[in-house]
Amino acid sequence: MTERLAGKTALVTGAAQGIGKAIAARLAADGATVIVSDINAEGAKAAAASIGKKARAIAADISDPGSVKALFAEIQALTGGIDILVNNASIVPFVAWDDVDLDHWRKIIDVNLTGTFIVTRAGTDQMRAAGKAGRVISIASNTFFAGTPNMAAYVAAKGGVIGFTRALATELGKYNITANAVTPGLIESDGVKASPHNEAFGFVEMLQAMKGKGQPEHIADVVSFLASDDARWITGQTLNVDAGMVRH
């Protein structure tokens, strides 16, 4: 594996476990200095320690503007600013439509969509202030295309992330900052393993062109590509990484 991201600094949110941790590990293997951020401070520290000397842990709550401001101030002091932003942090609820109330809706939108905006606002401002070309890669979900049941607020938020990514590409292209989204399908992450709805995942596999459960590393590989110079002419796109569940 070549260090194609040597000299770059990447921030990965929600990186204490699962897909986020795999992305952080892959970007570090590619040579980047990686900021492992998570609301779970101890989890972030453990993940950074497992990745090695290229990783630094900084706890943050992406839905709290003050916490995000402090996060980027610390990144600026440590590294001089980011080149790559991976918006991975989110919460994944399974709630039947009849049980979706306004508090639930606001909580999911605040973290999964507004939190993505808060971090992206701060991250791209930091890139622009340094005059850096940059990468913004947001982890959305193929549930947006599938209209997955029992996840109405989550589906809406992730659809918003896809729309936001397209608009962001238009706004930031003139600064050589690209914006793309990745939509995972069924991934054997910590959340999936712990889900009380595990029995439903067999049906998801039936819809896939390729059988089996994806691994967090499958998403990390795609993010690695989008973060690299190989993807310098790709922006405003959404890449489905779901074994062909969504085909269009």
From Swiss-Prot:
Biological processes per GO annotation: vitamin B6 catabolic process
Biological pathway: Cofactor degradation; B6 vitamer degradation; 4-pyridoxate from pyridoxal: step 1/2
MF terms in GO: pyridoxal 4-dehydrogenase activity
Binding site residues for substrate: 141
EC number: 1.1.1.107
Positions of NAD(+) binding: 11-35
pH dependence: Optimum pH is 9.2. Retains 66% of maximum activity at pH 8.6 and 57% of maximum activity at pH 10.0.
InterPro entries given in the database record: NAD(P)-bd_dom_sf, Sc_DH/Rdtase_CS, SDR_fam
Gene3D superfamilies to which the protein is assigned, alphabetical: NAD(P)-binding Rossmann-like Domain
Chemical reaction(s) catalysed: pyridoxal + NAD(+) = 4-pyridoxolactone + NADH + H(+)
Keywords for the protein's UniProt record, in alphabetical order: NAD, Oxidoreductase
EC top class named in words: oxidoreductase
UniProt temperature dependence: Optimum temperature is 50 degrees Celsius. 37% and 33% of maximum activity is seen at 30 and 55 degrees Celsius respectively. Stable for 10 minutes at 45 degrees Celsius or lower, 76% of activity remains following 10 minutes incubation at 50 degrees Celsius and 1.3% of activity remains following 10 minutes incubation at 60 degrees Celsius.
Residues annotated as the enzyme's active site: 154
Subunit organization: Homotetramer.
Function: Involved in the degradation of pyridoxine or pyridoxamine (free, phosphate-unbound, forms of vitamin B6). Oxidizes pyridoxal to 4-pyridoxolactone, but does not have activity toward pyridoxal 5'-phosphate, pyridoxine, pyridoxamine, pyridoxamine 5'-phosphate, 4-phthalaldehyde, 2-nitrobenzaldehyde, pyridine, formaldehyde, 2-carboxybenzaldehyde or sugars.
Family under the similarity heading: Belongs to the short-chain dehydrogenases/reductases (SDR) family.
Stated name of the protein: Pyridoxal 4-dehydrogenase
Species this chain originates from: Mesorhizobium japonicum (strain LMG 29417 / CECT 9101 / MAFF 303099) (Mesorhizobium loti (strain MAFF 303099))
Gene: pldh-t
